Amino acid sequence: MITPFPALKKLTLTAALLISSLSANANETPTNATITPTWQQTLTQAKGETVYFNAWGGSQEINDYLLWANTQLQQRYGVTLKQVKVTDIAETTQRLLAEKTAGKNSGGSVDMVWINGENFRSMKRNGLLYGPFTHQLPNWKYVDKSLPIDKDFSEPTQGLEAPWGVGQLVFIYDPETLSNPPKSFKALLALAQQHPGKISYPKPPEFHGTSFLKAALLELTMDKQALYQPLQLPQDQALFNRVTAPLWHYLDQLHKVAWHQGKQFPAGTAETIQLLDDQQLLLAITFNPNAAAAAIANGNLTEKAKTYAFSAGALTNIHFLAIPWNANAKAGALVAINFLLSPEAQARKADTSLWGDPTILSPQAFTKLPAPYNQQNFKPYPSIAEPNPTWLAAIEQQWQQRYGN
């Protein structure tokens, strides 16, 4: 599942002028003198191709961003980017598995996917990905190699997917109603006990809800390292029970004093932000460090709202773009991904009035863009690595058995 984002502000006239200037001045594509023969061949092959891009479709702002990207790709390269909106990329994984089983090794229905975590691991392990390809991308040179881009939920990426953005599990609060926000899950429970009905989290398996469970477990368990090793059930059932026991004990206590006594949960991050703004909750939860700024810009939160992470750091992952092994438009997908890694496209994506997804490029990549896009100074919170994805389904299933009904 890919990180959803809250509703963001529409493009203002000022922002439109900045973006127009940005588009005119961006230099994301090498000049003809620096284009390699191999990449020129890719550009030639891509012209006229339609790239069917399977991506989460739950945010109008992200959908609008992809429409903009399609326009740019058509005008510059003759490539059409067609978003195929899905609720969960696991659906795409199953479709690709079916094509693999049927022996459909070319002319596939999917040309590009937005993935991370368990879906990447599944696609990689089942031979569903094309590549390695990242070394072919001219804009790969701009990527900030200090970010954890070489692993995806502990699974080595090996050039089979290109990083697109950064997600961190953070909280939003209003200083006027909560002057001293909790800095740990233990402190969060204490706050909930002091203010019954004011704390909640999205219902798993919604991405943010599951992320809340993983982050809590990483703090509470006595065997953190086990979470970074593959879990094999049923033989590891005793290990699973022992490692996760502190989480269920914690949630038993939290739900007693949670919003609706833990019998009802927000649908996702957008609802937690709305409940925070309505003063029904003291904290909202998001996987986008820019979400508060975006919600403020959109008028969905007080201007005093702040974002923060717990003292131990923030659960962190990168979300990626990949190409299936049987894609019908591999060249077009390579051109589309290269464009989405350009300073221009990354700066627009990071704009909190448009999407607000933090960039994965180094700050130096933006120096030739007009202000304010020439200063992309995203500074991530101290990061906590995602557990091995094999734990995910077991945690969600156990949560469902205990609390889902």
What are these regions (language model features)?
Residues 2-12:
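Bacterial N-terminal signal peptides that target proteins for export
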Residues 12-21:
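Bacterial N-terminal signal peptides
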Residues 24-28:
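Boundary at the C-terminal end of the N-terminal hydrophobic targeting segment
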Residues 29-39, 274, 375-405:
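Conserved C-terminal helix/tail region of periplasmic/extracytoplasmic solute-binding proteins
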Residues 38-47, 59-80, 171:
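Short, polar/charged alpha-helical segment
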Residues 56-68, 84-91, 106-270:
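Extracytoplasmic ligand-binding site segments that recognize negatively charged/polar headgroups
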Residues 260-322, 365-366:
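Extracytoplasmic/periplasmic substrate-binding proteins
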Residues 314-383:
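Mature extracytoplasmic/periplasmic domains
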